[in-house]
Design a protein with these regions (language model features):
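Bacterial N-terminal signal peptides that target proteins for export
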Residues: 2-11
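Generic beta-sheet signal
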Residues: 36-38, 146-154
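Short, surface-exposed amphipathic charged segments that create phosphate/polyanion-binding patches used
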Residues: 125-133
Length: 193
């Protein structure tokens, strides 16, 4: 094969690959600007399962918290989201400290605690009611967020109940929702490295 033709083919492949990546980046930002998409994110790395006995939501020292690696992951995800073209976002967090820390480290303008994102790991019987509350919150927020991204930082159990997807720490689910806040379809977005 002529080396010049081979180089041209490689160059065209590289251009196509870059264009594909840029299109995907713009696609995420564009979807999150619409009223029918929301990004659910599992908090970043907090080693262990559940919380210690006798934990309280008002005292982070009693909870399972982000590790140093988890804090770095949250900061990196915030950078990645901005590199995808997401410059404005309404960020909401579960009341658990590992979620609040993840939300803060994303470094969007501000974030707020939202009770419907609270974990029901300690009492799985709460799953249906909690999911209905989350759907109601999503339905309300997608109507009022304008073109800002809606980012919800929560827990594995909440995302599994909402989307039926097992996800790792820092993974995200881009959910298309209907007017009632119910998921129509979703795309798993693994934690960027």
């Amino acid at each position: 094969m002529n080396p010049r033709i081979h180089i041209q083919k490689l160059t065209l492949c590289a251009i196509w690959l870059l264009a594909s990546v840029w299109a995907q980046a713009g696609d995420l930002a564009q979807k999150l600007q619409s009223a029918d998409h929301v990004l659910l994110m599992r908090h970043t790395l907090a080693p262990g399962v559940g919380d210690p006995d006798n934990y309280t939501l008002t005292d982070c020292k009693t909870q399972r918290n982000l590790s140093a690696e988890g804090r770095q992951q949250a900061t990196a995800i915030g950078h990645w989201l901005r590199n995808q073209g997401i410059t404005q976002a309404e960020v909401y967090s579960s009341p658990w400290c590992r979620c609040k820390d993840t939300a803060a480290l994303l470094k969007f303008t501000d974030w707020q605690v939202e009770p419907s994102l609270a974990s029901f790991f300690d009492d799985m019987r709460q799953a249906p009611a909690s999911t209905r509350a989350l759907q109601g919150f999503i339905a309300e927020k997608t109507k009022t967020k304008g073109n800002k991204a809606l980012i919800l930082v929560t827990h594995h159990v909440n995302i599994f109940e909402f989307a039926g997807e097992n996800i790792a720490s820092g993974d995200m689910v881009l959910a298309k929702v209907n007017a009632q806040g119910q998921m129509v379809s979703y795309q798993l977005i693994p934690r960027p490295h």
